[in-house]
Amino acid sequence: MHWLEVVLLGVIQGLTEFLPVSSSGHLVLFQGLMGMEEPELLLDICLHVGTLAAVLWVFFAQILEAAKGFFRFCAAAPKGKAAMVQVWTTDQDARMALLIIIGTIPTGFIGMGFHKIADKLFASPVLAGAMLLITGALLWATRYVRTEGKLLPKVTWGNALTVGTIQGLAILPGISRSGSTICAALFLGVDREVAARYSFLLSIPAIVAALILEVADASAAAHPPVSMLLLGGIVSAFTGLAALKWLLAIVRKGSLWWFAPYCWLVGATVLVANFV
């Protein structure tokens, strides 16, 4: 693998991990264009570590507050159900922490179910193209979502389970994780900013779990030089940081649908190229 390919993959991962256009779908497509049979596992891990670092940087304060809230909820547990319910209803940081845990449960089950067939899924540009069309449709539909939604105290555990399920299904190449989860929250009536914040905080356990699985699989795999791995991770982190901040601004404006035509164009191009 050449240095330029590593930089390009870092840029693709950084942009598409956060912009609602599917990082997995684009990596499948670009790897096909570069003639790589399979992604090099350790490089893929470093690319995801880079984007994880971007999320941790942007949301560090919220992560810290959510952790404190979770411990307050745990401290209330010995006092009985009434005390736990009070924390759930009045402590927004504790509520966010619990919503993340609840949403992670279906994501984990779906991820484990797909883990054994992930290689086959990621080898299919046709599947990525078709799923990009679906991603585009979801993004376009956000044009019709009301401008003011429910704030965090009104977000329910059922909402969290739904968004977590959607996040699990986003393992399919071409389905944007950020796009599908933000869209799901918006369709459930959640406020734009809360939807975006919850989507990215919910991504952290999923990314960490996926990295753990990949590290276990990568122990005996060949890998590029360490310098290339570091380069890919750094490029991914800085590109991801810029993309994440841009997307948050776009979500606040209610302009997620801007990305729909791009998803349709790329998805249709892939399908035509594979069937014509």
UniProtKB/Swiss-Prot annotation:
Spans traversing the lipid bilayer? 1-21, 41-61, 97-117, 121-141, 155-175, 200-220, 231-251, 256-276
Q: Which reaction does it catalyse?
A: di-trans,octa-cis-undecaprenyl diphosphate + H2O = di-trans,octa-cis-undecaprenyl phosphate + phosphate + H(+)
For this protein, what is the EC number? 3.6.1.27
Any single biological process term in GO: regulation of cell shape
Which cysteine-cysteine pairs are annotated as disulfide bonds in the entry? none
- A GO cellular component entry from the record: plasma membrane
* Membrane topology listed for this record: Multi-pass membrane protein
A GO molecular function term, named singly, is: undecaprenyl-diphosphatase activity
Q: Which domain of life is it from?
A: Bacteria
Q: Which UniProt keywords apply?
A: Antibiotic resistance, Cell inner membrane, Cell membrane, Cell shape, Cell wall biogenesis/degradation, Hydrolase, Membrane, Peptidoglycan synthesis, Transmembrane, Transmembrane helix
Instruction: Indicate where this protein resides in the cell.
Output: Cell inner membrane
- Pfam families, sorted: BacA
* HAMAP family, alphabetized: Undec_diphosphatase (MF_01006)
Job of this protein: Catalyzes the dephosphorylation of undecaprenyl diphosphate (UPP). Confers resistance to bacitracin.
Give the family from UniProt.
Belongs to the UppP family.
Miscellaneous comment: Bacitracin is thought to be involved in the inhibition of peptidoglycan synthesis by sequestering undecaprenyl diphosphate, thereby reducing the pool of lipid carrier available.
Protein name per Swiss-Prot or TrEMBL: Undecaprenyl-diphosphatase
